[in-house]
Regions:
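Bacterial N-terminal signal peptides
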Residues: 10-19
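Small-residue-rich helix-loop
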Residues: 100, 114-116, 395-398, 402-560
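A short, well-structured edge-of-sheet supersecondary motif
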Residues: 93-117, 348-349
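Conserved serine DD-peptidase/penicillin-binding transpeptidase domain
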Residues: 28-33, 54-93, 140-436, 525, ...
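Boundary at the C-terminal end of the N-terminal hydrophobic targeting segment
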Residues: 23-29, 47-49
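Short active-site loop at a secondary-structure junction
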Residues: 116-136
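Bacterial N-terminal signal peptides that target proteins for export
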Residues: 1-11
Length: 560
């Protein structure tokens, strides 16, 4: 299990760690003179000699020896000249990151700056944004906060028949029917809801089962998300009632020949109201999966476009479902039928305050009953916020992250619109003493390319979180090098080093970031290193950038 130092107070080991030892460096300068040949945790003893024989390349070694020309660590304006800072200078000259933006800030809690380069430059954080969202939510709402989903009805019950509608009153729970192990299995959840009907004496519903997502107002997704992302499961938006994280699974396979239509069929959840336009074609062997899905929340229609290579095996794609509340009502409707309870009026959701039964019609029905006017017969609760935050950070779950941000707005300012949520987030920053005047936040997950954070802001937030009463729970939500979802990080380092590096990745096209905490081998809280490393506009694969960032984190770990 990952060792979480006693410096982090109540934090407990929660992540399974992969074992590993020190591995020799792969000195590849002769065949790749533009690359950096790196080994872990050492000094710059041989860099100058290597530069003489291989111009443009630098070898960082951990031989244990010391160059007679090595400059001892000195303090200049709070910054220590050290292996990490020197290496950061070398990295900036390397061809891999040439022309890209590269920024870093790493400080000890006690005040020393270990490494710094362009720390105030605003950059795209990608999923490093989730560190901010989860931390703010845990600090403001508390680690044991839970969402509630309730059942209520309009009308009257007579002789076992509900003369009215049954409402599933959403409370923002993002885990309903989720596959995550922390979530309540959907059939168990439905059995609890059915038990509430039985206890209330309802054996038949004369009206409809209505999925009510009004707890979250405002658009279901952020307008600054890329258009091609909107239909994929990374951009599942939602209101106050969801189902299966608002994911639609679709089985896809190549056609019989190149140019033939791709075969696509919905798998789960069942959404018989949906119509699909299949305008994707079978591509040549080796061209891969280039499918895109374009749905809309206004009608029950989605279009699948792009290509799918003929040599690919069938697979299940995950797309976004724009009708989460309606889907939840429909799934519960079907469950009740298996128990002999029928809803005569079918299913519906609530849009613009009105009951909607036909998803293709722009003419909605009567106004939905006010929640306060319903007779509530029971409710269920979500897992704790700290459990949801753990999955948010480990899985880098965008849907959970967006829900957490909008929950801050709903709980603190009675509105879940993004504008209200930003105000709430700034309130949290103020309570933590974090200056957010130099950043721009446009969502909770990092999917938006309109988010602009700097390493100095991320570091200041992470440092401030160490003073939060909820920090012991927060640190447990952050992954560990070598642990779950980070098995390949710092792979050449010892288990001791990997166990001390708590990190969150951030990745999208051209973006690779890591931020987090590094525990000291020995020492006090003041020796904890807080770091943020950000690269933007890189024209290479993440697999080419990761070894450089891994080495920076390894050098940082060697500093304490």
């Amino acid at each position: 299990m990952g060792r979480i130092n006693s410096l982090f107070a109540s934090a407990a080991a929660v992540l399974a760690m992969a074992s590993g030892g020190l591995a020799p460096a792969q000195a590849n300068q002769r065949t790749n003179p533009g690359n950096l040949a790196l080994t872990s945790g050492g000094n710059l003893a041989s860099a100058q000699a290597n530069q003489r024989t291989h111009p443009g390349s630098y070898a960082l070694t951990s031989s244990g020896g010391h160059s007679t020309e090595q400059t001892p660590a000195v303090r200049e304006g709070g910054r220590r000249q050290n292996r990490t800072q020197e290496y950061v200078g070398l990295v900036s000259q390397n061809d891999i990151l040439k022309g890209s933006q590269f920024s870093i800030l790493a400080v000890k809690v006690g005040g020393d700056t270990i490494a710094s380069r362009n720390p105030d430059t605003r950059m795209l954080p990608a999923s490093n944004m989730k560190l901010i969202t989860t931390g703010a939510a845990i600090h403001a709402l508390g680690p044991d906060f839970r969402y509630s989903t309730r059942l209520g009805y309009s009308g009257q019950i007579k002789d076992g028949v509900l003369d009215g509608d049954l409402y599933i009153i959403g409370g923002g729970d993002p885990t309903i029917a989720s596959k995550d192990s922390m979530a309540v299995p959907r059939f168990f959840l439905f059995s609890q809801w059915a038990g509430m009907l039985e206890k209330a004496g309802i054996r038949e519903i004369g009206g409809r089962i209505i999925g009510d997502g009004r707890y979250f107002d405002g658009p279901i997704e952020k307008d600054s998300w890329a258009y091609h992302d909107i239909g994929c499961s990374d951009a599942c938006g939602g209101d106050g009632l969801c189902f299966y994280e608002n994911i639609q699974e679709v089985k896809v396979s190549a056609g019989s020949s190149v140019g033939a239509p791709v075969c696509a069929a919905p798998v789960f959840p069942t959404t018989p109201w949906m119509r699909y336009g299949i305008n994707a074609r079978t591509g040549k062997a080796g061209t891969g999966d280039n499918l895109y899905y374009f749905p809309t929340e206004y009608v029950a229609y989605g279009e699948i476009v792009g290509s799918y290579a003929i040599d690919l095996k069938p697979r299940t794609e995950t797309f976004s479902n724009k009708f989460g509340a309606y889907t939840c009502a429909y799934q519960f409707f079907n469950y009740l039928k298996t128990k002999g309870i029928e809803a005569k009026g079918g299913v519906a959701d609530v849009r613009m305050g009105r009951i909607r039964t036909d998803l293709d019609s722009q003419e909605y029905g009567s106004y939905a009953a006010k929640v306060d006017d319903l007779t509530v017969i029971g409710g269920t609760q979500s897992p704790t916020l700290k459990e949801i935050a753990l999955m948010t950070n480990l899985k880098s779950d965008n849907f959970y992250a967006e829900t957490l941000l909008r929950t801050l707005g709903r709980r603190m300012h009675h509105s879940a619109t993004y504008d209200s949520s930003y105000v709430a987030l700034n309130d949290v920053f103020k309570s933590l003493g974090v200056d957010a005047s130099g950043v721009q936040i446009r969502d909770g997950s990092g999917l938006s390319r309109h988010n602009y954070l700097s390493p100095s802001f991320i570091v200041s937030f992470l440092k401030a979180m160490m003073g939060s009463p909820a920090f012991g729970d927060y640190i447990q939500t952050i992954g560990v090098a070598g642990g779950a979802h980070y098995e390949s990080r710092l792979a050449s380092e010892s288990t001791d080093v990997r166990n001390r590096v708590h990190l969150k990745s951030g990745s999208m096209n051209g973006v690779r970031c890591y931020s987090g905490y590094i525990e000291p081998r020995d020492g006090t809280k003041e020796d904890v290193i807080v770091f943020s490393i950000m690269t933007n506009n890189a024209l290479v694969r993440a697999s080419q950038v990761d070894p450089i960032l891994d080495r920076i984190m390894a050098f940082l770990a060697s500093e304490n």
